[in-house]
Design a protein with these regions (language model features):
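N-terminal secretory signal peptides
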Residues: 1-14, 18, 25-30
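Structural transition elements
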Residues: 38, 325-358, 374-377
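N-terminal lobe/hinge region of extracytoplasmic solute-binding protein
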Residues: 52-104, 135, 197-198
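Gly/Pro-rich hinge or "lid" segments in bacterial periplasmic/extracellular proteins
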Residues: 87-91, 176-228, 232-234, 240-242, ...
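Surface-exposed binding/hinge segments that line
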Residues: 112, 146-188, 206-208
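Ligand-site clamp/hinge motif
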Residues: 220-266, 386, 394
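Extracytoplasmic/peripheral linker and loop segments enriched in polar/acidic and small residues
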Residues: 390, 394-405, 431-497, 522
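Long beta-strand-rich cores associated with HINT superfamily self-processing modules
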Residues: 495-522
């Protein structure tokens, strides 16, 4: 299997679309922005890009094994590259790997590494760097990518610029796996990440986690033609949505992520601002309960919570309609393996009350929320509380600090607010969050049936059967796991009309968090 389709790929029963289109481009749309005129512009050098973003904290690190949100992803891609990049339509495309192929069965892969690429230090990229970089996330490590790399049994150097990866069982989606944002390519032997030594377009100038990150363009031509255009980039941490919007409107920043949906209609009337909206690929918003902890061990209690939330009311009021209904699992409607038959549970206070009574729960319920998790988290929690009251269920909403939320609250407390970003394949979406050994299994859900289904689906050659297996996987998660996923949001970015390159993307906002690399000023 290669990014140039080969007989080996054909023998797997996969056509080019099936091989590379990890997320169908269903729902991609850019709204309100005057893109036809922009499309005529050609990239040019110069200027200072000022970003105002949500999705980071004072505990952020430059170590790629620690990343968990948009700001670390964004600054990391200024300095480093990956083997595989995901394009705007969700295809796996070459980055530092110029091509790849697999033997029939997809258990053995060969990646050909680009030649003539240098790190900031002047070192030339080679196979040893690639092997070391992947192995940072294998073995004894706390990296969230450990789980998705667990099937790898061996990474072997075939030549100075060729690497062979062998797996326990085949996985037709391995190129997508290697696009995980933790898997940055660093020089062999790197242990100190405080001074990024990468193959990216920029070098680090100033590092103030929780405040700002400043980078400048490297001297000479970046190895990607037309990219890495800004003289420098200033990324500011602006966690408050109103403050981000104000910074954009007043010209203090050139682009922001995660616009408050309530302000979008007004912003779209501003002739100096473009709003980029991407449907069906945005964050999955919800609440997660640890199902191995009381009282959430009770399946009936979880059903009470799932029937006791008024999803539409939250979407209409908190997200101003810029979201689709969530069905308690995180494979989104833009994925080709999405189970469209799995409908979201309608708000049913009577049914919620029935399951709550059946659960026999005497413990008080508490959900921890923070707008540091996502803008609207607190309001969503309060509306959840109100909808549960109609079922006779009492739940306290505890507001907590956004600083350190992902370190101190998420996966630590029994019930809390959460959002999940999009992954390029259903397998990655499920494996990261819901498999028994997943590093970010934030509900502590363990299902041998689910584990077996997902692992089997990776090597299933019949596309129809594979779709059925992922559909059943989603059903199991929706019915049995500890997530109340009430919405799949639209991605909503805002930018100055002078800025180019902020386009809809099948995975993440801010053009897959690569705006610093892809953008330029008109």
């Amino acid at each position: 299997m290669t990014n140039q389709l080969t007989p080996e790929a054909t023998s797997l029963g996969l056509d080019r679309r099936q091989l590379l289109a990890g997320s169908a481009a269903v729902g991609l749309a850019t709204a309100f922005a005057a893109l036809p005129a922009q499309a005529q512009d050609k990239p040019k050098k110069g200027g200072v890009l000022r970003l105002g973003m949500e999705g980071g904290s004072a505990s952020d690190s430059l170590d790629p094994r620690t990343y968990a949100d948009s700001i670390p992803i964004s600054y990391s891609l200024m300095f480093w590259n990956q083997l595989v990049e995901i394009d705007a339509k969700g295809n796996a495309t070459p980055e530092l790997a110029e091509s790849w192929e697999s033997k029939a069965g997809a258990a053995e892969w060969i990646f050909n590494i680009r030649k003539g690429i240098t790190f900031t230090s002047g070192k030339t990229l080679d196979a040893d760097d690639v092997i070391y970089s992947i192995n940072l996330h294998r073995g004894e490590t706390k990296s969230p990518a450990k789980g998705i790399l667990e099937p790898i049994t061996e990474i072997k150097k075939l030549s100075s610029h060729q690497v062979q990866i062998t797996m326990k069982t085949g996985n037709a989606d391995l190129p997508f796996v290697l696009s995980d944002y933790h898997l940055l390519i660093v020089p062999n032997g790197t242990t100190d990440f405080s001074k990024p030594d990468g193959t990216g377009a920029y070098t680090l100038v100033e590092w103030q986690p929780g405040v700002r990150v400043v980078a400048k363009r490297k001297a000479g031509n970046y190895w990607k033609a037309g990219r890495g255009n800004f003289d420098s980039v200033e990324l500011r941490y602006i966690g408050d949505a109103a403050a981000r919007t104000q910074a954009l409107v007043t010209g203090q920043v050139d682009a922001v992520n995660r616009l408050n949906p309530k302000t979008v209609a007004l912003l779209s009337k501003n002739k100096n601002i473009n709003v980029t909206r991407t449907k069906g690929t945005g964050n999955r918003y919800g609440f997660v309960a640890l199902v191995d902890a009381d009282p959430y061990k009770s399946h009936d209690l979880m059903l009470a919570l799932k029937y006791g939330i008024d999803r539409k009311k939250i979407i209409d009021n908190v997200f101003s309609g810029y979201a689709s209904m969530g069905n308690d699992q995180t494979v989104g409607p833009a994925d080709r393996f999405y189970n469209a038959a799995l409908k979201a549970k309608s708000y049913d206070p009577d049914r919620a009350a029935f399951h709550f009574k059946k659960a026999g729960t005497s413990a008080s319920l508490e959900v921890q929320v923070s707008d540091g998790c996502y803008s609207g988290s607190t309001d969503s929690g309060v509306m959840f509380q109100e909808s549960l009251k109609k079922a006779g269920i009492s739940m306290e909403v505890k507001r907590v600090s956004g600083d350190g939320y992902w370190d101190n609250v998420w996966m630590k407390v029994p019930f809390c607010s959460v959002f999940w970003g999009n992954r390029p394949t259903a397998d990655l979406q499920i494996s990261t969050q819901f498999l028994s050994g997943g590093a970010w299994n934030d509900t502590h859900f363990k299902s041998p049936a689910l584990d077996k289904l997902v692992i089997s689906a990776r090597v299933e050659l019949n596309e129809k059967k594979r779709k059925e297996m992922y559909a059943e996987s989603q059903r199991i998660i929706s019915e049995d796991a500890g997530m109340v996923c009430f919405a799949v949001g639209d991605q909503m970015d805002g930018s100055s009309t002078k800025l180019r390159g902020l386009e809809s993307h099948a995975r993440y906002d801010m053009n897959d968090n690569r705006l610093a690399e892809k953008g330029w000023f008109a």
